[in-house]
Amino acid sequence: AVLYPPRKVKVTAHPGIFENKLAEHQLVSGQSLFYIGMPYSYEFLTKGLYADFDLQTEFCEIGPGIYYSGQVPRETDFEHPDPHLKVEDNTQIQVDQVWDDISLLIDTEKGPVVLLGCAHAGMVNVLNHFCKNTGYKKFHAVIGGTHLGFQGPGEQLEKSLQALQDYQVDLVAVSHCTGQEIGAICYNRFPERFS
């Protein structure tokens, strides 16, 4: 919708968005890989819809008070890639680290707001990354997908919830890949802050 009608629009994204992304699913007939990557080619987006890509891997400010995470370092020992997500590079298929999953930080009057994509790097890694790059020690809100729904209850969930506490997050608004069970756990932990 942003690129239609066709006109020149700057799009900041990770160069990995055009990789051959696959998801492994267990079917009755056995395990199979399905394409889940970008539905449109770089050529179509740039020549057909006039997207002006600014492919970035590093943290940067993309507008006044709007920060692009870039590639988030995987530093915690409890946040791991989803083994069912794969990437094909030439003829090799391997677990996708999902380096192209991007989060944003937006400065607001109430404080910094973190918008998570799916937090494939792990929510704690994302929050720590923004803390290191901006100096913020407190976030007003964390909104978006946490990918915790695929991990289930356990160490990663507990440490992620503790990070929300440690960073004094005022508003917790998790979505899609967090899952209903983990969303309910978040609500029970932070009923006054959950949305």
Label the predicted regions.
Residues V9-T12, Q94-S103, D107-F194:
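Cap/insert and terminal regions of metallo-dependent hydrolase folds
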Residues I17-I102, Q165, S195:
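Metallo-beta-lactamase
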Residues A1-Y4, F18:
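Di-metal (Zn2+ and/or Mg2+/Mn2+) metal-binding site signature of metallo-dependent hydrolases
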